[in-house]
Amino acid sequence: MMNKNKKLMVMAGGTGGHVFPGLAVAKQLQQQGWQIRWLGTADRMEAELVPKHGIEIDFIQVKGLRGQGLMRLLKAPFQIVNAILQARRHLLTYQPDAVLGMGGYVSGPGGIAAWLLGIPVVLHEQNAVAGLTNQWLAKIARRVFQAFPGAFADASVVGNPVRQDVVQLAAPEQRFATRNGAIRILVMGGSQGARILNQTLPAVMAALGEGYEIRHQAGKNSQQDVAEAYAAAGVESAQVTEFIDDVADAYAWADLLICRSGALTVSEVSAAGVGAIFIPFMHKDRQQALNADHLVACGAAKMIEQPELSVEKLTQMVRELDRAQLLSMAQKARQAAKLDADKVVAQAIIAITE
């Protein structure tokens, strides 16, 4: 059934972990005739990324409050009210049938403004620990979804919306069927890179010696330094890039992924069907470690928390994994995947607006 006159405003920003899942849901609704508009901030990644997907974006001025100085905290109530009023103006102009909050600072004022106008609010929490904004908005939302168990006591667990090119990869047993020779290691630190991975992996690869290939995504402005570190360690064959343009192709190539455990990364690893060693970013609520827990528990991944990371420990962990074990991990990752989160969330939005 087409919904030619229905409109959704997606509220998401700051990081790819919020924006990409929002785009996945938006595409599902566009295929059913919905009009989509975005609410974001002008100085974060959504300002450039969202229009590339053919979606118009409105901006409000809002920043996070954690770790701010006294003057910023004193000004905060006025800034929040101003952001709510800005969001309200955009909502009154666009007149959406529902709003979808995917997290990030922009979701707070946008969600409150929508609620005050009587517009249904739908939330999706990508992490195993709910962000502050979503904790607040969950009290006023019509539907709340979570990617992993534990963020909310009574929200539906649906996984994270994942890009279709990742979902559509061949099954691990097909990819591994003709592989022999060197174990293929993919290192990903996100768009900004992960300094600890950039510092540790050249020495790990040197210690592992022959029998391994590596592709290393080093992040913004780090490619040359990391490439030089590999060369200095005597690892001449390392392929070091700043970004990976085709992530699905990189997952398909890899036998083993070494990476952080941000919400979207964990969901993509599972959807792709790749065995992983997670090195969670240190955070006081252990958010990334908790994101990875379910894949570790089912045998699809291993984890070394950052305070315990050493060249020796990571080298030993990699050395213990042969291709048969990596195939088993990849199969378990794929079996654990929830591949229809975008469809489930889109269907809920349709249902509450009928």
UniProtKB/Swiss-Prot annotation:
Its EC number(s): 2.4.1.227
Location in or out of the cell: Cell inner membrane
GO biological process: carbohydrate metabolic process; cell division; cell wall organization; lipid glycosylation; peptidoglycan biosynthetic process; regulation of cell shape
CDD domains named among the record's database cross-references: GT28_MurG
Stored Gene3D superfamilies: Glycogen Phosphorylase B
InterPro entries cross-referenced by the UniProt entry: GlcNAc_MurG, Glyco_trans_28_C, GlycoTrans_28_N
This protein's pathway: Cell wall biogenesis; peptidoglycan biosynthesis
Pfam families: Glyco_tran_28_C, Glyco_transf_28
MF term (GO), any: UDP-N-acetyl-D-glucosamine:N-acetylmuramoyl-L-alanyl-D-glutamyl-meso-2,6-diaminopimelyl-D-alanyl-D-alanine-diphosphoundecaprenol 4-beta-N-acetylglucosaminlytransferase activity
Catalytic activity: di-trans,octa-cis-undecaprenyl diphospho-N-acetyl-alpha-D-muramoyl-L-alanyl-D-glutamyl-meso-2,6-diaminopimeloyl-D-alanyl-D-alanine + UDP-N-acetyl-alpha-D-glucosamine = di-trans,octa-cis-undecaprenyl diphospho-[N-acetyl-alpha-D-glucosaminyl-(1->4)]-N-acetyl-alpha-D-muramoyl-L-alanyl-D-glutamyl-meso-2,6-diaminopimeloyl-D-alanyl-D-alanine + UDP + H(+)
Keywords, comma-separated and alphabetical: Cell cycle, Cell division, Cell inner membrane, Cell membrane, Cell shape, Cell wall biogenesis/degradation, Glycosyltransferase, Membrane, Peptidoglycan synthesis, Transferase
Residues that hold UDP-N-acetyl-alpha-D-glucosamine according to the record: 15-17, 127, 163, 191, 244, 263-268, 288
Membrane topology recorded in Swiss-Prot or TrEMBL: Peripheral membrane protein
GO terms for cellular component: plasma membrane
HAMAP family: MurG (MF_00033)
Annotated family: Belongs to the glycosyltransferase 28 family. MurG subfamily.
NCBIfam families named in the record: murG
Primary role: Cell wall formation. Catalyzes the transfer of a GlcNAc subunit on undecaprenyl-pyrophosphoryl-MurNAc-pentapeptide (lipid intermediate I) to form undecaprenyl-pyrophosphoryl-MurNAc-(pentapeptide)GlcNAc (lipid intermediate II).
Protein name: UDP-N-acetylglucosamine--N-acetylmuramyl-(pentapeptide) pyrophosphoryl-undecaprenol N-acetylglucosamine transferase
Origin organism lineage: Bacteria, Pseudomonadati, Pseudomonadota, Gammaproteobacteria, Vibrionales
